């Protein structure tokens, strides 16, 4: 009986092993295919990931707590995808994994928001580790010296060039000379959108050029799409994506129209203290999200979209509002984000791509 039982046991073990071998690729595929961007915000008292009052990097306009915001609930929500759970950010693991590497954010003040968030997340993990901050031209660098990690920001709001010429400041939709600053990076996170709608004194160019055609202005969404196409061609023709991993930060939304989140009386994010607790934003996605996804779809080389628009749309409560740059005499900043806050989640998702 013993030998027969052993034979049955061995046969069962063999069948189980074969089943596991067959299922492993499917399990791996399920993990790889996890949708990190569809989910909801849940209250979690283990958040935020760092104390904003002790982070030395946060600029005045993002430092809501220091600027007197009395409620701190906005920093105690965790993003929970419907189909999986994000690995919690581990700063020490991130530093070790990226030892000696160069990571650069390229874009506007939303890139600044995310860059400072990641710097705080890392600093809180190794508070006694030496760091330096240097600025050269448009590029600022936090260096975590013990790990040789350079965390960079290139302030480039359009990604394409603005050139001063005799005729004025020309926005060249088909030119990327700043790309020379990006090619040596190990990881790049790009972003552009918010400046494309600027007009008047806030607009940093006088003319738009495509090829030999120069014009005073054009449809801004069309210009945005052309610039993204130029950037995409640069990725395909210049960047070595075997050396450099490329991400694109999705469109970061603003909250200036309460009707879009089902509160018609609200003229902006001022006074908002709770996120939307569902999985969808009543006003839907802004049109520029489709433009961005269409442009990314034309790129041959691998580019990962950090598709943070919907999860950020649900956070009408998390902007600086009157606790930002303009203070309480302003109409309120409903475009940028308090730190700690929503950009920490963008970086947790980035961490799940880069480390996990």
UniProtKB/Swiss-Prot annotation:
The gene is TBL41. Contains 2 motifs that are conserved in esterases, but it is unlikely that this protein belongs to the catalytically active pectin esterases. A motif (DCXHWCLPGXXDXWN motif) lies at residues 333-347. This is Protein trichome birefringence-like 41. Disulfide bonds: none annotated. Keywords: Membrane, Signal-anchor, Transmembrane, Transmembrane helix. It is a single-pass type II membrane protein. May act as a bridging protein that binds pectin and other cell wall polysaccharides. Probably involved in maintaining esterification of pectins. May be involved in the specific O-acetylation of cell wall polymers. The chain crosses the membrane at residues 12-31. It is found in: Membrane.
């Amino acid at each position: 009986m013993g030998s027969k039982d052993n034979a049955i046991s061995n046969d069962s073990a063999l069948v189980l092993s074969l089943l596991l071998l067959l299922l492993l690729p499917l399990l791996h595929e399920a993990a790889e295919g996890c949708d990190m961007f569809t989910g909801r915000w849940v209250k979690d008292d283990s958040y935020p990931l760092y104390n904003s009052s002790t982070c030395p990097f946060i600029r005045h306009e993002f430092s809501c707590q220091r600027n007197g915001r009395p409620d701190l609930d906005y920093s105690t929500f965790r993003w929970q995808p419907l189909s999986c759970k994000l690995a919690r950010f581990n700063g020490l693991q991130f530093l070790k994994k990226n030892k000696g590497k160069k990571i650069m954010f390229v874009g506007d003040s939303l890139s600044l928001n995310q860059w400072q968030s990641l710097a705080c997340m890392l600093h809180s993990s190794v508070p006694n580790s030496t760091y330096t901050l240097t600025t050269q031209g448009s590029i600022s660098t936090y260096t975590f010296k013990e790990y040789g990690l350079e965390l960079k920001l290139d302030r480039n709001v359009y990604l394409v060039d603005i050139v001063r010429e005799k005729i004025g400041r020309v926005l060249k939709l088909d030119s990327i000379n700043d790309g020379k600053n990006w090619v040596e990076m190990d990881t790049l996170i790009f972003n552009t959108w918010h400046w494309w709608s600027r007009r008047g004194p806030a607009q940093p160019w006088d003319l738009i050029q495509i090829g030999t055609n120069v014009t005073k202005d054009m449809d801004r969404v069309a210009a945005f799409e052309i610039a993204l196409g130029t950037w995409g061609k640069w990725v395909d023709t210049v960047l070595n994506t075997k050396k450099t991993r490329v991400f694109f930060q999705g469109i970061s939304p603003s909250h200036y129209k309460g009707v879009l989140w089902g509160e018609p009386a609200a003229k902006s994010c001022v006074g908002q203290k709770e996120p939307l607790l569902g999985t969808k934003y009543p006003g839907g996605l802004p049109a520029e999200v489709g433009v961005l996804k269409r442009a990314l779809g034309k790129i041959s080389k691998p580019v990962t979209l950090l598709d943070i628009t919907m999860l950020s749309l649900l956070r009408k409560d998390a902007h600086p509002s009157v606790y930002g740059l303009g203070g309480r005499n302003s109409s309120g900043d409903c475009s940028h984000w308090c730190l700690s806050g929503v950009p920490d989640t963008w970086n947790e998702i980035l961490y799940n791509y880069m480390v996990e």
